[in-house]
Structure formats: C-alpha cells, structure tokens
Amino acid sequence: MTCTIIVGGQWGDEGKGKVISYLCKKDNPSIIARGGVGPNAGHTVEVDGEKYGIRMVPTGFPNVNAKLAVGAGVLTDPEVLVREIEKLQKFNVGERIIIDYRCGVIESKHRDLDKSNEHLSKEIGSTGTGCGPANVDRAMRTLKLAKDVSELSKYLGDVSEAVNNAIESGDNVIIEGTQGSLLSLYYGSYPYVTSKDTNAASFAADVGLGPTKIDEVVAVFKSYPTRVGEGPFPTEMSLEEAEKLGVVEYGTVTGRRRRVGYFDFELAKKVCKLNGATQIAITCLDKYDPLCYGIIDYNELSEKGKAFIKEVEEKVGVRVTIISTGPELSQTIDIRNK
C-alpha cells in the first residue's frame, strides 16, 4: 500500500497530468482523489493519440478500475463538472466519481466578479473562473455547498471516508495536486498567486487525510519552467528565445501564451523542502534535448539529457525517479525501483 501525492514544483503547467496519468495506470490505485483550488487549473491528458483538457475531473480518469474523487477542499463548478463527465462518458466517469458533499460551489456571480475586478483580471492575471471570489464567500460562511445543488446529488459522498478506507484496506491511493507550489497563497510570489495554498500538506487536507497517511510526495518539474499571468520569473527568457528553442506553449484554461524560463535549481530545492518531496519527476526532457524524444530506457538518453538529470539530483538533493520524454504515457522512464 502506498499513498502518493503529486505536486507541481513550479508555477503550474509542469506536465502533472501526464505524470499522474502514468502513475494511475502503472500503480493501479483503487481511488484517485483531487485536491487543489478548483477549476482554475487545467490538466491535459493524451490517451491513444486523443487529447483531453480537463479542469474538474481527476486526471487519472483513464484508469477505469479506480474510483475518482474531488475532496471537500476543492471548489466545484457544476457546469464545468457535468460537461466533463459527459465528455468522458466512454471512460465511465459518471459512475465512478465522488464529489464531497462539503465542496464549495462556484456560481455565475463569482465568475462575473473575477472577470470584472480590475485588480484580479489585469494586475494579478486571474483565470476568471470565480475561485477567488468563491473562496472569499467560503471564509465568510456564505458559500453554497455541493450538498445544496440538486444536479450534483447523484455524485455526492464522503471523500475523506472513502480515501481513508482505501488506505486501511491496503490499497494504493493517489492524490492529485493542481497548479504549482510557487503559486501558493502563502509561499508563492504574493500577490501574484492563487487564492489558496498549493502544497502537499494542503492537498492531503483537501481530501481529508492526515499527514501520517502520506508515504510519497512526487514534485513535478518541467525542464523549461513556464508561467501564465503576471508576477516575478527570475530565469525568464525572451519570447524570441523561447521560439528558437521550440518551447512555445499556451495555457489549458486561459489560452494565453505561457512565459518560459530556464530551470531554477535554487527554487526547486526550496520547493522540495516545502513539500517534503521524496521523489522528483522531470517532464519535457525532449524539449531540453530533442535527442531524448520517446526514449524509455534511461541508459539510452543523450549525454546532455543524463547530465541535466544528474545536475537536478545533485543541486536539489532529491532523486529523480520519473522522466517524461514525450506526450504519450508510453514515453516515460520509470526508475523508482532501480
């Protein structure tokens, strides 16, 4: 039995969706629970060549044997959730998903306020999904909960009980984090942050798990970090330089072009300490060196690719156990047991 949390090590968009999907297929957990803020973060999952952009349903949905759960600490947008469940019908998501009855609910008034507030939309670069205003209402104890929304009734349950029961039964459990550690309301580059903490301890609390139940924390880092929206970015490169390197990307939720930078070893070290990371997953190694594309054996990586992995381990102080070399789940190097 292993309970694993996956956390973003940068400003989101690290490729957590790919890593989570891989682990959910490889480790075959009985339940995959989502922590985090809400539908302000998007994950892209590629299954058999088809891409799925999702914001509410847990990224591990391709594992049709696992229950899917959205923890009480996650804000829920019923419109987004129902739309995703319908879109993912062939994966039988509607019959497997549990929405905690204590989840806060985002309404149209929250989205409208998010988009119309000049400070949030222009200065901070909010995604406009209503999460910040909804969290304000939660703090004021006026927010509607999932149990109050009739269209969610057939999906409701107690996620904390489900996750704890799975652990007690000796099953594997995976907890998905969203966004990235550097967007944390408390530990990120305030005020250019999200409306809540985005670290491993908070993700455990989001799904109702105590800290002693966590076995592994996997921090996910992209070889070239990216950021959407405003805020400091110490190693940022010019857009022209990013184009030359072939690392032009757009946000899953906003569609905005992502800012790109070089790997920041010092920040990565701080993030791993903050999250108690036991493992590191490196994504987009094929962007760092195209010769690494599609490689599934560590020994076959280019010298440049190996040198980068070694540098991460030496400077950050945490072992790299998972390496993504392409968008497909099969394009993954897994050295956790080596």
UniProtKB/Swiss-Prot annotation:
Residues annotated as binding IMP are D13, E14, G15, K16, N40, A41, G42, H43, T127, R141, Q179, T194, R256
Spell out the molecular function terms from Gene Ontology: adenylosuccinate synthase activity; GTP binding; magnesium ion binding
- Any idea which positions bind substrate? T252, V253, T254, G255, R256, R257, R258
EC number(s) per UniProt? 6.3.4.4
The protein's matches in NCBIfam families, at most eight in alphabetical order, are given as: PRK04293.1
Q: What does this protein do?
A: Plays an important role in the de novo pathway of purine nucleotide biosynthesis. Catalyzes the first committed step in the biosynthesis of AMP from IMP.
Under what name is this protein listed? Adenylosuccinate synthetase
- Record organism: Methanococcus vannielii (strain ATCC 35089 / DSM 1224 / JCM 13029 / OCM 148 / SB)
Q: Which gene encodes it?
A: purA
